[in-house]
Amino acid sequence: MLRTMLQGKLHRVKVTQADLHYEGSCAMDQNFMDAAGILEYEAIDIYNVDNGERFSTYAIAAERGSRIISVNGAAARRAAVGDKLIICSYVQIPNEDARHHKPNIAYFDGDNIMRRIAKAVPVQVA
């Protein structure tokens, strides 16, 4: 049996561009992709913190160091410049390996500056 597990996450990045007429995708700073282990053309899910939209597309690289997050094509109708996003990729792992799997999680401030990288989501307390 395979389990679908979180592989990489960009937590609370800010949309810097939304281009309805660009070929579909989400362009992101290559440094961001490297931190989360997201590959170019990999399927990603995007969760818009500001409006609750959830959608799928694929990743493409933007210039390294640019801090760009550009939502393109039809997806541009689901995210506006300034919106905060959570961008995730997933991997299928054999059941026996799933309990030991650790995702790559990059956390950002409001200016798309990476503040830390982690291998787990903090435990939620009451």
UniProtKB/Swiss-Prot annotation:
It holds the Pfam family Asp_decarbox. One of its GO terms (biological process) is alanine biosynthetic process. Is synthesized initially as an inactive proenzyme, which is activated by self-cleavage at a specific serine bond to produce a beta-subunit with a hydroxyl group at its C-terminus and an alpha-subunit with a pyruvoyl group at its N-terminus. Keywords: Autocatalytic cleavage, Cytoplasm, Decarboxylase, Lyase, Pantothenate biosynthesis, Pyruvate, Schiff base, Zymogen. The active site is at S25 (schiff-base intermediate with substrate), Y58 (proton donor). The keyword Lyase applies. Its EC number is 4.1.1.11. Its main location: cytoplasm. Binds 1 pyruvoyl group covalently per subunit. It catalyses: L-aspartate + H(+) = beta-alanine + CO2. Pathway: Cofactor biosynthesis; (R)-pantothenate biosynthesis; beta-alanine from L-aspartate: step 1/1. The modification Pyruvic acid (Ser) is found at S25. Catalyzes the pyruvoyl-dependent decarboxylation of aspartate to produce beta-alanine. Belongs to the PanD family. This is Aspartate 1-decarboxylase. The gene is panD.
